[in-house]
């Protein structure tokens, strides 16, 4: 079977690795154009491109798949199937129709819940009990196609956006290989999604990471986990932006953002409802540290009565 793979970040690269180890022929890889990255803003290849180049697979990086030249280029590859994972470009219907068996997508949620760009983080933020990967047939709508198979994992009270991402990146690739086998032998037909159950996972926005201490502590604790490792929740203290990487629910009352107490166990801050104990912080110019380490060296910065967010 001739497969074209389309994907961009590390999550997608894990899927490409599994396909390279499968019996199927990867005839080409599509990925986003190289982007400036790092302090020097050098053009850097995507994780998928780096892997493809290492395996001598032809790489295509069109700005769009909406023009006739790009579509003709894809058609010339004569793909039986296109596997799409976190690619980042919209595939118009004419592209979806090119492969003999169509296009399939590995999506990091239990569809139809959390269609869209940031399903992993939104599941943690919402306090969902479980997440997973759905392999589906692609159609013109956003993550709306018939579902071929699902794999499920519980979301623990300690999971972050990062830990859930890594777990799903391990679960998704074998599911895709299994789905391809089911398509090839005709055993997988697909289950229509119930649009009434659909929710949308909006793209992450850095502005969302600024902590609003008037919100309930339970919501903020989930947000802090969801936005770790990116974009990372933060709040102002003494005119500096302090990153908050971990927190636990606590008790206490005060003005939202007010420091209620500080000890080696954590920095207790009042919220709109209850309080949070901040247990891992990063000060400007420094590295992430447990609050017990910060408390030893910067005790005066975290005096009770100070207010975060100002």
From Swiss-Prot:
Its EC number is 2.1.2.9. Signal peptide: none annotated. It holds the Pfam family Formyl_trans_C. It comes from the Bacteria. InterPro entries: Fmt (IPR005794), Formyl_trans_C (IPR005793), Formyl_trans_C_sf (IPR037022), Formyl_transf_N (IPR002376), Formyl_transf_N_sf (IPR036477), Formyl_transferase-like_C_sf (IPR011034), GART_AS (IPR001555), Met-tRNA-FMT_C (IPR044135). Keywords: Protein biosynthesis, Transferase. (6S)-5,6,7,8-tetrahydrofolate binds at residues 109-112. GO terms for molecular function: methionyl-tRNA formyltransferase activity. GO terms for cellular component: cytosol. SUPFAM superfamilies: FMT C-terminal domain-like (SSF50486), Formyltransferase (SSF53328). Belongs to the Fmt family. NCBIfam families: fmt (TIGR00460). Attaches a formyl group to the free amino group of methionyl-tRNA(fMet). The formyl group appears to play a dual role in the initiator identity of N-formylmethionyl-tRNA by promoting its recognition by IF2 and preventing the misappropriation of this tRNA by the elongation apparatus. This is Methionyl-tRNA formyltransferase.
């Amino acid at each position: 079977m001739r497969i074209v793979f389309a994907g961009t970040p590390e999550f997608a690269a894990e899927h490409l690795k599994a396909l390279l180890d499968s019996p199927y022929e990867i005839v080409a890889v599509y990925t986003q154009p190289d982007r400036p990255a790092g302090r020097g803003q050098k053009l850097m290849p995507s994780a998928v491109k780096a892997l493809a180049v290492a395996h001598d697979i032809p790489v295509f990086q069109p700005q769009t798949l909406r023009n006739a030249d790009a579509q003709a280029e894809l058609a010339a590859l004569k793909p039986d199937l296109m596997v799409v994972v976190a690619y980042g470009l919209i595939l118009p219907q004419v592209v979806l129709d090119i492969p003999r068996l169509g296009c399939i997508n590995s999506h990091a949620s239990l569809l139809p819940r959390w269609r869209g760009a940031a399903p992993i983080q939104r599941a943690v933020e919402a306090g969902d009990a479980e997440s997973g990967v759905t392999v589906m047939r692609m159609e013109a709508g956003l993550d709306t196609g018939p579902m071929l198979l699902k794999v499920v994992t519980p979301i623990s009270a300690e999971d972050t956006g990062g830990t859930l991402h890594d777990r799903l990146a391990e679960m998704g690739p074998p599911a895709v290989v299994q789905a391809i086998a089911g398509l090839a032998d005709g055993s997988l037909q697909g289950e229509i999604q119930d649009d009434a159950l659909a929710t949308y996972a909006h793209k992450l926005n850095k502005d969302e990471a600024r902590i609003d201490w008037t919100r309930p502590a339970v919501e903020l604790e989930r947000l802090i986990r969801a936005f770790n490792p990116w974009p990372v929740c933060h709040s102002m203290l003494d005119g500096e932006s302090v990153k908050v990487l971990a927190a636990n629910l606590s008790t206490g009352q005060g003005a939202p953002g007010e420091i209620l107490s500080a000890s080696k166990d954590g920095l207790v801050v009042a919220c709109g409802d209850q309080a949070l104990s901040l247990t891992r912080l990063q000060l400007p110019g420094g590295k992430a540290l447990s609050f017990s380490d910060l408390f030893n060296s910067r005790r005066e910065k975290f005096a009770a009565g100070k207010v975060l967010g100002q």
